[in-house]
C-alpha cells in the first residue's frame, strides 16, 4: 500500500510507526541542511556521524545507498546520495535511476513501511 502525506518527516515517521526513514544525504554523510539535518538532529548528530565515519572511508557516489541504525530516532536510516542538478549531464535520468535503486533496495531488504521524502528537490535543485 502506498500512502502520500505531507508535513514534518520526523513527526510522520513516529505517527505512522514506520520501519525506516530515507535520508537524502550529502556525499560525506555529514550533518546537513533541510531533511538531512532534521534526521541527524532526531537520530543524534554525534552518534550517526561517528558511526558513518567509522564504517565507511570513501564518500558516497551518486545514487549510492547506505543503511545505518537510527539511534535516538529508533528507525533505520536509509541514506541515499541523490544527483545534483548542476553536476549531471542528464539529471532527470539520474534521478529516475535514484528512485529505482531505492525501491529495489527496499524490496531487497524486505521493508514494509518507509518514509521517503522528495529526493534532490532542495539543495540539489532538481
Residue spans for each PLM region:
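Conserved acidic residues
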Residues: 18-19, 75, 112
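Short, basic/glycine-rich phosphate-binding loops at helix/coil junctions
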Residues: 72-86
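N-terminal short beta-loop-beta anion/metal-coordinating cradle
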Residues: 50-75
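Phosphate/ribose-phosphate-bearing ligand recognition and processing surfaces
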Residues: 83-126
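Conserved, mostly hydrophobic/aromatic
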Residues: 22, 78, 116
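Short, conserved "active-site rim" segments that organize catalytic pockets and cofactor/ligand binding
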Residues: 7-59
Amino acid at each position: 500500500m502506498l500512502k502520500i502525506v505531507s508535513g514534518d518527516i520526523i513527526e510522520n515517521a513516529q505517527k505512522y510507526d514506520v520501519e525506516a526513514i530515507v535520508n537524502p544525504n550529502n556525499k560525506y554523510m555529514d550533518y546537513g541542511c533541510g531533511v538531512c539535518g532534521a534526521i541527524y538532529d532526531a537520530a543524534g548528530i554525534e552518534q550517526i556521524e561517528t558511526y558513518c565515519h567509522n564504517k565507511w572511508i570513501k564518500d558516497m557516489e551518486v545514487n549510492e545507498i547506505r543503511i545505518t541504525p537510527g539511534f535516538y530516532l529508533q528507525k533505520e536510516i536509509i541514506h541515499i546520495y541523490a544527483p545534483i542538478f548542476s553536476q549531471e549531464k542528464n539529471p532527470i535520468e539520474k534521478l529516475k535511476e535514484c528512485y529505482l535503486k531505492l525501491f529495489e533496495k527496499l524490496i531487497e531488504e524486505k521493508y514494509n513501511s518507509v518514509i521517503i521524502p522528495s529526493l534532490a528537490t532542495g539543495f540539489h535543485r532538481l
